[in-house]
Curated annotation (Swiss-Prot):
InterPro entries: Pop5/Rpp14/Rnp2-like (IPR002759), Rnp2-like_sf (IPR038085), Rnp2_archaea (IPR016434). This is Ribonuclease P protein component 2. The lineage of its organism: Archaea, Methanobacteriati, Methanobacteriota, Methanomada group, Methanococci. Part of ribonuclease P, a protein complex that generates mature tRNA molecules by cleaving their 5'-ends. It comes from Methanococcus maripaludis (strain C7 / ATCC BAA-1331). Its EC number is 3.1.26.5. Consists of a catalytic RNA component and at least 4-5 protein subunits. It is found in: Cytoplasm. GO terms for biological process: tRNA 5'-leader removal. Keywords: Cytoplasm, Endonuclease, Hydrolase, Nuclease, tRNA processing.
């Protein structure tokens, strides 16, 4: 059986609060595609894999993105350069960066923090998202 990695050897993460300004409503898969394409265009496959972007939560137009600590500047610059999605203008505004989801929700998104297991229970009752 494999042991879990101690905290000193784990990947250091940062959480980024995003606001996406787009004329149509975007779904989670669209936001993932936008972020990955922006990173791929700016820093290539290697930079995208080092950044390891992961969408934690998205409610149009706000979202929370997990990113590697070393690649935060790379993400900022790539998202600021991305200006088009489906041949329509898009603007991605980074509201703030923190090292905890709770802090992101309370300080930047002004949403009370909900324990993760409750979020998963709601999603199971609600069904899959598009």
């Amino acid at each position: 059986m494999l042991k879990t990695l101690p905290p000193t050897l784990r990947e250091k993460k940062r959480y980024v609060a995003l606001e996406i300004i787009f004329e149509d409503e975007l779904f989670q898969k669209d936001v993932i595609a936008i972020v990955r394409n922006a990173l791929m265009n700016y820093s290539g496959v290697l930079g995208c894999s080092k950044a390891n972007p992961w969408l934690i939560d998205y409610n149009h137009p706000y979202g929370i993105l997990r990113i590697s600590r070393d690649e935060v500047d790379n993400l900022r610059s790539s998202l600021s350069l991305s200006n088009e999605h489906r041949k329509k203008p898009i603007n991605i505004h980074i509201i703030g960066i923190s090292n905890s989801v709770k802090h992101i929700r309370e300080k930047f998104l002004h949403v009370p923090h909900e324990p993760y297991y409750k979020v998963i229970q709601k999603l199971k009752k609600k069904g899959p998202k598009r």
